[in-house]
Swiss-Prot record:
Assembly and oligomerization: Forms part of the receptor complex that consists of at least 6 different proteins (TOM5, TOM6, TOM7, TOM20, TOM22/TOM9 and TOM40).
Entry keyword annotation includes Transcription: no
Residue numbers on the Cytoplasmic membrane side: 2-30
InterPro entries named among the record's database cross-references: TOM5_viridi
One of the protein's GO biological processes: protein transport
Source organism of the structure: Arabidopsis thaliana
Family: Belongs to the Tom5 family.
Location(s) in or outside the cell: Mitochondrion outer membrane
Record's protein name: Mitochondrial import receptor subunit TOM5 homolog
Length: 54
């Protein structure tokens, strides 16, 4: 049970360090933007990919 509390505290510390550090936040936002663009491209091609076929 004690290990569970320690891991929660570690997760809180990780979240705090990732969100409140400006350099890490900028990198995380770039990664999120890239992931969003990739997911959007996959959805677009799944929906309208047959229209691109020649």
């Amino acid at each position: 049970m004690v290990n569970n509390v320690v891991s929660i505290e570690k997760m809180k510390a990780l979240w705090h360090s990732e969100v409140h550090d400006e350099q890490k936040w900028a990198v995380n936002m770039k990664l999120l933007r890239a992931l969003g663009m990739f997911a959007g491209g996959v959805v677009l091609m799944r929906s309208y990919g047959d229209l691109m076929g020649v």
